[in-house]
Amino acid sequence: KDLVIEGKLSDYGLNNTPAALRKEKEMRFKKSKPMDSITDLDLNTLSRNVTVKEYRYGPLNPEDEKGSKKFWEDKAEMWDTTVEHAKTSRCSNCSAFNQKPATINKIAKAIGDQGKKIVKQSNIGFCEFFWFKCAGARTCDAWVGGGPIT
């Protein structure tokens, strides 16, 4: 499966990590499986960065009301709703948010010694749409109700 749908991450200028850009070049000639990005941090970062650019994954810091104000206003406008209602549509309740025990354990193990703590604190899951470790407090333009997958 091609990770980049409409463009290349390198098309987006300076807001990219060198590791993700290197992985993008490497992946031109390789195929990956959805869960490969759980153990490959560069692939995870590539998939996440593409989702930020193509599907407006965010906000950067969901707990920062002031800093994420424009993000939520844009989401509300896109979905033709109020900011308050848009804020109820999060990765944590998306149908593509995989929080099956086996998935969570694999994520925690890949993180390392503090994996279980980090997974719990950030409410991490795996995005089945875009193949990256996803924070439950965020959202994207592809959000679909009815989740998570448990």
Q: Each predicted region: which residue ranges?
A:
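Cysteine-centered metal-binding/redox modules
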Residues: 5-8, 13, 28-150
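Terminal and domain-boundary regions
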Residues: 19-22, 28
